[in-house]
A protein has these predicted regions:
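Short, charged/polar "capping" segments at the starts of alpha-helices
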Residues: 39-42, 114-115, 162
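Residues at the C-termini of beta-strands that transition into short coil/loop
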Residues: 35, 54, 67-69, 108, ...
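Internal alpha-helical scaffold of NAD(P)-dependent oxidoreductase catalytic cores
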Residues: 23, 96-97, 119-125, 138-247, ...
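Rossmann-like NAD(P)(H) cofactor-binding subdomain of soluble oxidoreductases
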Residues: 57-142
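Nucleotide donor/acceptor-binding cores
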Residues: 1, 29, 76, 124, ...
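C-terminal active-site/capping subdomain that shapes the small-molecule cofactor and substrate pocket
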Residues: 235-281
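A structural signal for isolated positions on well-ordered beta-strands in alpha/beta enzyme cores
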Residues: 4, 30-32, 105, 127, ...
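NAD(P)+-binding Rossmann beta1-loop-alpha1 motif at the extreme N-terminus of oxidoreductases
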Residues: 1-56
């Protein structure tokens, strides 16, 4: 199969890196990185440097790294790992590379990503998905996985279709990715949204890390309040969430390293565009 990872940032670098380490250069699969700028040039020259939480450095060489759709060829699986504000542009780039059998798996933050992709790629099968990882670009060609288990949840809208995508779960797990094909994927996406939207907002507002926010009573109460508000929105939309979703989200935040920052906080601190649109929608 021909697998493309669109966006080789913190998320795409980790999951794309895992896939390329396992499958690139093998007869059965091609793993293609779609990136841009200095990051792309560095990957082309030296491969992607993926740093693990333990400090180990892995060199990842994909089958192809490019920013040109004409070099990509026909794709069977596409993982979208871009920022939300670049989603449609990135999807339009590969419209000539996908077909009716192409499976698209977005790993972005947000609760409307699948719908947005289906508008641009109506002939593809677009699944829903979310991930838990603390990872970011440290420099051109370098991605550092700092924390989080790397857990990936994904699935189709209809639970009756779940077995059609068991092969994708096997493919991801074969690359050492903690992937679970689930029937309640919308609940998983909202659960992630409650977690990441709240932490992104409060850490960016306060200019603090996960650990610093959680140990401050005022910040923690603000975090809890924001989580409860998003929980209420999810329930109003018909989501059946666990009763302890707020407490579990706080526990999840505490499982990350003290110095963890959200991608929105990192972007805000560096003066780059942020994903505030999806966090405050």
């Amino acid at each position: 199969m021909r697998i493309a990872v669109v966006g080789i940032g913190g998320v795409g670098g980790f999951y794309g890196g895992k896939l390329a380490l396992a499958y690139a250069g093998k007869r059965e699969h091609d793993v293609i990185f779609i990136a841009r700028g200095e990051h792309l040039q560095a990957i082309r020259k030296k491969g992607l440097c993926l740093i693990t939480p333990e400090g180990e450095t892995l060199t990842v060489v994909p089958t192809l790294a490019t920013d040109r759709s004409e070099e990509v060829g026909t794709l069977d699986i596409v993982l979208f790992c871009t920022k939300s504000y670049g989603l449609e542009e990135s999807a339009r780039m590969i419209t000539e590379n996908v077909h009716d059998g192409t499976v698209v798996l977005p790993l972005l933050n947000g609760v409307n990503i699948t719908e947005r992709l289906r508008k641009v790629l109506p002939g593809c099968t677009v699944l829903n998905g979310c991930v838990y990882i603390g990872s970011n670009i440290e420099g051109p060609g370098v991605v550092h996985h700092k924390g989080g288990t790397g857990q990936l949840f994904f699935g189709p809208d209809r639970k009756e279709d779940i077995e059609k995508f068991r092969y994708l779960e096997d493919l991801l797990r074969g690359a050492g990715i903690k992937a679970d094909l689930v029937e309640d994927v919308a609940v998983q996406v909202w659960t992630k949204y409650i977690f990441v939207s709240s932490f992104a907002g409060i850490t960016s507002l306060r200019g603090k890390t996960f650990g610093a926010v959680l140990e401050n009573d005022e910040d923690r109460k603000m975090l809890q309040g924001l989580m409860a508000e998003i929980e209420a929105v999810a329930k109003a939309k018909g989501m059946h969430l666990p009763a302890d979703i707020v407490e579990e989200s706080l526990r999840k935040g505490a499982s990350f390293p003290y110095a963890t920052k959200t991608s929105m906080q990192l972007d805000y601190e560096k003066g780059r565009p942020t994903e505030i649109d999806i966090f405050m929608e």
